[in-house]
């Protein structure tokens, strides 16, 4: 994995959950496991529409194009499988209604766009999705909005969750890092930080300078920890398998610590590691049989997969992992989002 040059709040939070997850993220050989999901697609749509509030082209045109682009990427990531249509994405209808209302509240203001690629901020606020880099520390980030209200400096992060309330500890940490970046750039510590929902509600807190400094310090420690592991090796002791950390991790099929630690009562999609004993194609679908290696409660049981998306038909003796399928041991059928991963020969 590549060392971290500038850590972002997202990477810091991920390291706090599991350092191995970030190592997978920064390993180019694992790129095929990183794919968009309906949830991330909808989140991207919401952020894009919020940036364009008041655009002269109108809500419907902006919304429809954002959805079409997100769905195209989703299809590209999962081809030849066909992901669910946008109308069936969780939260799609409610997000659309809330954004339409936000659009109406915004009037006909100029489009909320600023190139995120520019690291040098403009002379005046507001800043919208502008990348900020700390001049002395290995930290960078892109706050959604930095603005001044009644002479008070605010840092805002837009959240697309349907039940957002006060910032969670992770959201608070993210905002505090952004505050540190704004302070380093402007020379002024923000007074307030807040998460903002698609309804326009803001859940704020007063920014404490000491808390900001502590958060920046934790980010530097995380960079040092990760880069030390990148230089010396990512041992399994650096992984932190747990239900919350692993539930949405795209690398479960490649992660030995997860497969060794996973418990039967973890509320996580089925994942299995198996050694192939036979493989064939019937009615244009792969039918692959194997013997389970992990998880522990299925060891040595037979596993038959039907229609799984193997890049090439597996060979007898190979070891494969699969996740997000329909069924379980002893037999399972592929879903649109089933992922397979061939383990290297031991």
Protein language model features and the residues they cover:
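Short cysteine/histidine-rich zinc-coordinating motifs and their immediately flanking basic loops
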Residues: 29-30, 258-268
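Beta-strand/loop nucleic-acid-binding surfaces
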Residues: 291-316
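Structural detector for short beta-strands of small beta-barrel domains
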Residues: 263-290
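A non-catalytic, helix-rich entry segment at domain boundaries
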Residues: 49-128
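Mg2+/Mn2+-dependent nuclease catalytic core
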Residues: 121-216
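Nuclease catalytic cores
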Residues: 9-58, 251
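Polybasic (Lys/Arg-rich)
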Residues: 213-248
